[in-house]
Amino acid sequence: MAFRQSEHEMSVTSLDSSVELRSRSPSPQVFNPRKLRFADDDFDKDTPEGASPQHPLQQRPKLSSGEEQQLDSKIGKEGGDGDVSMSPPCQKVRALRLFSTPATPKTILQKSTTQCSNHLSAAAAAVNASRRSDDLFRLSERPRSLPLHNRKLPTQDTANVNPFTPDSLMAHNKKRCRTQFGRENLNLNVNAMQKYLLSDACDDDVTEEAGDSMREIHQQAPKRLALHDTNISRFKREFMQVNVIGVGEFGVVFQCVNRLDGCIYAIKKSKKPVAGSSFEKRALNEVWAHAVLGKHDNVVRYYSAWAEDDHMLIQNEFCDGGSLHARIQDHCLGEAELKIVLMHVIEGLRYIHSNDLVHMDLKPENIFSTMNPNAHKLVEVQPQQTKDDDGMDSVYEELRHSENLVTYKIGDLGHVTSVKEPYVEEGDCRYLPKEILHEDYSNLFKADIFSLGITLFEAAGGGPLPKNGPEWHNLRDGKVPILPSLSRDFNELIAQMMHPYPDKRPTSQSIFSHPILSAVDSKSKLQLGLELTVEKRKNEILMNKLREAKKQIKLLEQRVNLLAVTNNPDSLDGQRCLRSFTRRMRTPFSSHGKFDSISDRNKNVITNI
């Protein structure tokens, strides 16, 4: 018993000495360590005024078992629900506990979190020391744990950035030092993060400023949205599937009818889920290219795209004429029809090249045709009075029964890339030039010209094309066979487009202005008749507008004259006199075809002249 008392006295003595050492040491301006002041607030309340309160380690109030349980529950509430209490469970052990007492791993982890919160609170106090002294004392006495990984950053609306838009291409063209860009972003991120973390101890203005800085970070460094984040259900809800148009390597194309507008569309759906796979970038690349290039008459029109069940779906224009590949399976095309194909495709290709983009997969399977839906309507509304004068009765009759009026369009833009920052994925080797297979991307425009030239060669009867072997090399070494069904000029043009050196191939603009594609030679009689009908219809509409404009001008003149008369009553009398005088002057002589009784100077009456 004596040994226990001496041990207790030694522990109390050590505690007293530690308290004295802390009291003698000069108080620094930094935050003091956390003190074990358990139930100290209740003890201070019970101390009468004027009496000096004793330290809780020297004299502690005697508590009953019920009060002890209430005290422990109060301490547990201050520590937080579910957190391990920093205080020992027993009052005697609590009095003997020092800061260097070993603790469990959970308490060590909680201490580290507390120290981190103390550090953040100190930084916040350094910024706002003049205005928030009370909050600093509260933070130093009872620091609050602040888990950084649970901090919720402000949610932002995000969207993809299309790399094929003119703004994106201009942004890529601006050269900028990587180190400078990294430093600016680093400074912006650090400053914004500091402001945001200290927002609890700062004013609302600082919080708003930090939030704005974080928004600037999100806007300046956009991320590509994954397909998982954009999954929506539209296919079965908005469209009714009619049949399958075609099946490719990566997707299936359906002919669908929109339930709302009743129009027919072609919806391309990927065969396999592309979200998170290696084909995700290619699917997004096709959507971006369609969104930028789908505004030309010779490019398949784009309407919308979405991700559904991790599959990519693209809503495009429905081309009722099918592909050029299906068209040349039955018969080879003649020179007249090949000129039409070349004229339409080169117009679409020239539009793509004008946007600093290249197709990189031009072939008969990716060239589609559509019938002109307005050809028969324009013939029906043609005025009857003009048919007798223009001598085009046979043309109109041929237009009524014609089904050969087609427009060729370029589709399947999955391999489209920019010439300034090319990301080339090789397409069909049967239509690619040698330099692309050798990874020479210095002249990508001419690669599309080669693909178009060999496509015309196949459509004219030069197919099927080989995938390898001597014949494959001969076609790329300038040894192009002469096709007997084509003229000499057309054979020479195809040979120039398939020249082994890219620099010697013609551009899309030079092909468009080639003499072989003149306005008269490249258009058939049916197309000329259709264009004539369209122009006459336009003239008729303009004439109707001119008549309406003349009527409006006449009404305005009458209103102006009426206003002038009402404002000037004197002018009204003058106008009346003038009208009466002019009316008298206009009155003819009263004669009925003969002069009746006209007298002369000699007073002789002349009758019956």
Swiss-Prot record:
Region annotated Disordered, chain positions: 1-88, 147-166
Keywords, in A-Z order? ATP-binding, Cell cycle, Cell division, Kinase, Magnesium, Metal-binding, Mitosis, Nucleotide-binding, Nucleus, Phosphoprotein, Transferase, Tyrosine-protein kinase
Q: In which tissues is it expressed?
A: Expressed in embryos; expression remains high in the proliferating cells of the central nervous system well after cells in the rest of the embryo have ceased dividing.
Q: Which residues carry this modification: Phosphothreonine?
A: 47, 165
Entry-linked Pfam families: Pkinase
Q: How is its activity regulated?
A: Negatively regulated by phosphorylation in the M-phase.
Residues reported to bind Mg(2+)? 366, 412
The reply to whether DNA damage figures as a keyword in the UniProt entry is no
Modification after translation is described as: Phosphorylated during M and G1 phases.
Instruction: Name a single GO biological process.
Output: embryonic development via the syncytial blastoderm
Which Gene Ontology molecular function entries are recorded, alphabetically?
ATP binding; cyclin-dependent protein serine/threonine kinase inhibitor activity; magnesium ion binding; non-membrane spanning protein tyrosine kinase activity; protein tyrosine kinase activity
Reactions catalysed according to its record = L-tyrosyl-[protein] + ATP = O-phospho-L-tyrosyl-[protein] + ADP + H(+)
Question: Which residues, renumbered to this chain, carry the PTM Phosphoserine?
Answer: 23, 25, 27, 52, 168
Biological role = Acts as a negative regulator of entry into mitosis (G2 to M transition). This kinase specifically phosphorylates and inactivates cyclin B1-complexed CDC2.
Which family does the record claim for this protein? Belongs to the protein kinase superfamily. Ser/Thr protein kinase family. WEE1 subfamily.
By what name is this protein known?
Wee1-like protein kinase
Its source organism is Drosophila melanogaster (Fruit fly)
